[in-house]
Amino acid sequence: VTXPDGKNTATNA
């Protein structure tokens, strides 16, 4: 998931 700031908020395991 990408937030409005363009940074990932979820990491794939």
Swiss-Prot record:
GO biological process: hydrogen peroxide catabolic process; lignin catabolic process
Reactions catalysed, as given in the entry: 1-(3,4-dimethoxyphenyl)-2-(2-methoxyphenoxy)propane-1,3-diol + H2O2 = 3,4-dimethoxybenzaldehyde + guaiacol + glycolaldehyde + H2O; 2 (3,4-dimethoxyphenyl)methanol + H2O2 = 2 (3,4-dimethoxyphenyl)methanol radical + 2 H2O
Single GO MF annotation: diarylpropane peroxidase activity
Pathway this chain belongs to: Secondary metabolite metabolism; lignin degradation
Broad EC category: oxidoreductase
EC number: 1.11.1.14
Entry keyword set: Heme, Hydrogen peroxide, Iron, Lignin degradation, Metal-binding, Oxidoreductase, Peroxidase
Similarity comment: family membership: Belongs to the peroxidase family. Ligninase subfamily.
Its biological purpose: Depolymerization of lignin. Catalyzes the C(alpha)-C(beta) cleavage of the propyl side chains of lignin.
Name of the protein described by the UniProt record: Ligninase A
